[in-house]
């Protein structure tokens, strides 16, 4: 009598195996080999599902559908999300140095509620800031956190990592924009830290006011340059006085004055240059948005279910944190049975 046989999708294509074989039950609910599952998840988190199945076809000469990759990727994204923020990945400091924390939001289009904000955090050491001559600097190693939804869960996730790191570093340095929830969180949770208002975000208020107030381009440019120099030296009150002296009735003048007065304790840029690696701008978190979120999740026409978006964020964070071995480990466990 002929034994029942099953087909498993592998990196060599479909392989028929006996029903009694240990692999016949599949892995995590899929009749797909562990290595093939890993490659499908890797491809799925790198590019849209409509494209990544072509990559697998080209590299392995194995045909898989975009729907297959979607299902496998989503399952692993949900599972790795249970522990994605539990491990510190930064190497210990070689000396007493500053730990930098940046956070910001990015809008993502969801099916259920339209545009929703993804909170993104980036943590890195001062010694990981690399400067090569006059070239733009870069950060050699970072840990990311990404959450779709409210700020309370996001800040708890950030605190879990920061608290594990904080005792090893001489100083915590937060660089953020002026959102009240960020400012209040830092003041409440880390009162002894250095809290910096992103310089470039602050300078945007100068530009917005100058565009409304000055008609002549040369006057506008000259005025902005003068105020930015003062801002760089931490002379916030002087900048505010200069705006008041113009006696502008434009709404941007009021917005600038109120914003600068509310955040002046976080605008001591002349002092911040002497701390750690001397950065006080949001370049690190801006590039993190592009790397972690935009590259994969904000392509033309994309809309996400909220659950699917968080699952993908979990995978993007795992990949960008350099922790892909955690996905490999999951392919070797049995965390999910077939339906």
Say what each PLM segment does.
Residues 1-7:
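An N-terminal, globular interaction/scaffold subdomain
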């Amino acid at each position: 009598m002929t034994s029942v046989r099953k087909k498993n999708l592998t990196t060599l294509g479909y392989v028929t195996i006996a029903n009694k074989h240990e692999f016949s039950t599949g892995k995590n609910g899929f009749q797909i080999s562990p290595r093939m599952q890993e490659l499908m998840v890797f491809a799925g988190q790198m590019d849209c599902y409509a494209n990544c199945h072509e990559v697998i076809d080209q590299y392995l000469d194995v045909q898989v559908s975009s729907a297959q990759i979607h299902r496998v990727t989503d399952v692993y994204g949900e599972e790795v999300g249970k522990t994605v923020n539990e491990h510190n990945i930064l190497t210990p400091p070689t000396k007493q140095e500053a730990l930098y924390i940046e956070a910001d939001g990015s809008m993502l289009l969801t099916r259920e509620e339209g545009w929703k904000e993804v909170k993104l955090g980036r943590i890195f050491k001062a010694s990981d800031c690399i400067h090569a001559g006059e070239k733009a600097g870069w950060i050699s190693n970072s840990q990311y956190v990404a959450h779709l939804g409210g700020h309370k869960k996001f800040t708890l996730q950030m605190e879990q990592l920061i608290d594990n790191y904080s005792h090893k570093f001489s100083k915590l340095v937060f660089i953020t924009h002026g959102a009240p929830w960020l400012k209040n969180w830092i003041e409440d949770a880390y009162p002894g830290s250095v809290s910096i208002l992103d310089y470039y975000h602050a300078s945007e208020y100068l530009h917005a006011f100058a565009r409304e107030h000055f008609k002549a381009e040369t006057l506008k440019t000259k005025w902005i340059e003068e105020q930015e120099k003062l801002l760089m030296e931490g002379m916030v009150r002087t900048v505010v006085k200069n705006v008041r002296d113009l006696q502008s009735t434009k709404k941007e003048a009021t917005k600038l004055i109120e914003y600068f007065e509310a955040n002046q304790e976080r605008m001591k840029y002349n002092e911040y240059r002497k701390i750690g690696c001397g950065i006080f701008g949001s370049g690190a978190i801006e590039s993190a948005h592009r790397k972690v979120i935009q590259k994969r999740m904000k392509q033309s026409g994309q809309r996400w279910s909220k659950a699917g978006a968080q699952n993908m964020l979990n995978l993007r964070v795992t990949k960008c944190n350099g922790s892909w071995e955690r996905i490999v480990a999951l392919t070797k466990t049995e965390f999910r049975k077939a339906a």
